[in-house]
């Protein structure tokens, strides 16, 4: 849909409006009594969420490519049907195709003080060229003083669908050097910065002193980002996710400014590798992330 059609079907005066940037990407601008947010139609990609009276919770690189067909650096990319590189020997875009395809906005309504949005993605020319047909994705966002993200995968095929998925959230922090993450203390992890070695559980909060890319399998734990310099805690709860990934590149990237990496941290809601999902024909699987902000008063 173009902006006129989106506005006609889904616009809510003072709450939900649609805009186009020079590259042609369209985004939804959300204002509720308790938060503001931005979601691009490409990738159903949330790039901003800010509860009233708080600093932004979601990080977006100022160097990010906001171009059709290119991934956005920051926000909440949706990885599907694989996480990171494809594993079956065939080529495909990093983190799959879902984040670089236009989704369809199917529902928008204000329920109390929260805005409910639903996006869908059906098979596309790109997905079929990569061997993926007969699936359905439904992505629900509940935007208010807290944020709920719910990704449902449906299998319309007559054979099982094996897939990986992630809500690859970039959180905004004041200084990653002063951030700790709790919740993963009892969990061993795969260290992608050290030749995929399996490392034992640290039994201590996670601190950041260099390039970090850790895959924590077999965990459903709630994580808390303690942003000391920002005097707040970001609570990340998840459902039907058995993998958590923690990432910071510790350097500039082509689409990440030289002084930006210390302002971000990814804590990702994932099902990947040994926790990949095998979905029977006619069945659906829903993974959820719920985030909230708590002020640090000490």
Feature map (PLM): residue ranges:
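Extended, loop-rich substrate-binding clefts of extracytoplasmic carbohydrate-active enzymes
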Residues: 17-18, 92-143
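Active-site/ligand-binding surface loops and adjacent short beta/alpha elements
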Residues: 158-162, 166-242
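Hydrophobic core residues within well-ordered beta-strands of beta-rich domains
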Residues: 137, 147-149, 285
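Asparagine-centered strand-capping/turn motif at beta-strand->loop junctions
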Residues: 39, 151-157, 293
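Beta-strand/loop-rich accessory regions of lumenal/periplasmic or secreted enzymes
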Residues: 70-96, 182-188, 195, 204, ...
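Beta-strand-rich recognition/accessory modules
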Residues: 1-33, 42, 124-128, 213-298
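Beta-strand-rich interaction surfaces with strong enrichment in secreted/lumenal proteins
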Residues: 67-68, 107, 138-140, 275-279
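Acidic-aromatic substrate-binding/catalytic surfaces of carbohydrate-active enzymes
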Residues: 33-91
